[in-house]
């Protein structure tokens, strides 16, 4: 495996050729500047001999059909392996769900991004590939963050693409973080990366980014980079700014960020999440409605169990509507403009 990676510099290809696991860990050096450690299929660490104090996790492919972030991360990995760029910050790349990537599907059995913070081991337990993999990914993040001294900045960008069109093509979800202000610097980094819209979540979740935020105090985000397309069919010119800013972050080049300015970004507050309680749950709007579509107060968003679910605020925007989820799961996130967010 080591020789195959050294020859091809294509970590994604190696991962997809061995989607369940590698035979064992291996490591090697790039020149006299970087140690590379491969911990498992889809798990590669770049450890600079001299680093600048940030610990960065870039994860992709938690959903197997969300291919643009996978191609973006593989491009960065290849540039690092080719020594076209040199890491100055510790960086962990995670290709989340290789089995689903090979299958060309969002999941194999279950939505992995609902299985973190230990949810993978709650009943029924480790009964499918997503649950097993989520537990392993948690362990790799823990190992990465906790094997160095405290006091370093921890960052985790969990990269996705959405199943539907969006009023805002690229947007990020800022996990719930009670007692901690939101980072204006991080929001402006995202804006410079082409991600000009941020949603502030209002409650704990079992997503990958919430896990890193809550457990390790990381500046963590779920980042949606556009729409789902098959592997190789993404217009990667739409990710030039994202690639550039991630490259600057990893190589410790100046980020040249603007000071936080709420007028330069779109900020939303999650006002509620609507879960499914009955099999007859249905939305009243078209199935192909775009993310961030706004509806006025009193509008009937959905019906289930003989009851209507109406817009409660003057206007509410919807993201990720999906009526076909299992009972108990989220059908949609409702948003209002964020006017008093604690951003510093």
From Swiss-Prot:
UniProt keyword terms in alphabetical order: Arginine metabolism, Hydrolase, Metal-binding, Zinc
EC number: 3.5.1.96
Enzyme class: hydrolase
SUPFAM superfamilies: Zn-dependent exopeptidases
Residues that hold Zn(2+) according to the record: 63, 66, 160
Molecular function via GO: hydrolase activity, acting on ester bonds; succinylglutamate desuccinylase activity; zinc ion binding
Pathway: Amino-acid degradation; L-arginine degradation via AST pathway; L-glutamate and succinate from L-arginine: step 5/5
GO-annotated biological processes: arginine catabolic process to glutamate; arginine catabolic process to succinate
Catalytic activity: N-succinyl-L-glutamate + H2O = L-glutamate + succinate
InterPro entries in the record: AspA/AstE_fam (IPR050178), AstE_AspA_cat (IPR055438), Aste_AspA_hybrid_dom (IPR007036), SuccinylGlu_desuccinylase (IPR016681)
Cofactor binding mode and count: Binds 1 zinc ion per subunit.
Keyword Metal-binding: yes
Catalytic residue list: 224
Cofactor(s), by name: Zn(2+)
Family the UniProt entry places it in: Belongs to the AspA/AstE family. Succinylglutamate desuccinylase subfamily.
Reported function: Transforms N(2)-succinylglutamate into succinate and glutamate.
Cross-referenced HAMAP family: Arg_catab_AstE
Protein name: Succinylglutamate desuccinylase
Organism of provenance: Shewanella sp. (strain W3-18-1)
Biological classification of the source: Bacteria, Pseudomonadati, Pseudomonadota, Gammaproteobacteria, Alteromonadales
């Amino acid at each position: 495996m080591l020789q195959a990676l050294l020859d091809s510099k294509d970590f994604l290809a190696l991962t997809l050729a061995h989607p369940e696991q590698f035979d064992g860990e291996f490591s090697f050096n790039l020149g006299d500047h970087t140690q590379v450690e491969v911990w498992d299929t889809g798990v590669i660490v770049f450890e600079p001999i001299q680093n600048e104090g940030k610990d960065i996790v870039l994860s992709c492919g938690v959903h197997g059909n969300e291919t643009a972030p996978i191609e973006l991360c593989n491009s960065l990995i290849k540039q690092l392996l080719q020594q076209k760029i040199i890491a100055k910050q510790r960086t962990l790349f995670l290709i989340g769900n290789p089995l689903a990537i090979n299958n060309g599907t969002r999941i194999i059995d279950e939505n992995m991004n609902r299985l973190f913070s230990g949810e993978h081991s709650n009943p029924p337990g480790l009964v499918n590939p997503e649950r097993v993999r989520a537990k392993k990914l948690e362990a790799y993040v823990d190992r990465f963050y906790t094997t160095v001294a405290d006091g370093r900045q921890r960052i985790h960008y969990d990269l996705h693409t959405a199943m539907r069109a969006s009023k805002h093509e690229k947007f990020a979800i800022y996990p719930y973080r009670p007692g901690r202000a939101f980072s204006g610097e991080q929001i402006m980094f995202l804006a410079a990366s082409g991600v000009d819209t941020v949603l502030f979540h209002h409650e704990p979740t079992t997503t990958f980014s919430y896990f890193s935020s809550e457990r390790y105090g990381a500046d963590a985000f779920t980042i949606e980079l556009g729409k789902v397309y098959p592997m190789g069919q993404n217009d990667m010119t739409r990710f030039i700014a994202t690639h550039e800013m991630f490259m600057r972050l990893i190589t410790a080049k100046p980020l040249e960020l603007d000071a936080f300015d709420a007028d330069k970004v779109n900020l939303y507050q999650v006002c509620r999440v609507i879960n499914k309680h009955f099999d007859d749950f249905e939305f009243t709007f078209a199935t192909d409605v775009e993310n961030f579509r706004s509806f006025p107060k009193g509008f009937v968003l959905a019906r289930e169990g003989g009851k209507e679910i109406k817009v409660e605020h003057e206007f509410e925007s919807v993201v990720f509507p999906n009526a076909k989820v299992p009972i108990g799961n989220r059908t949609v996130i409702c948003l209002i403009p964020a006017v008093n967010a604690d951003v510093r």
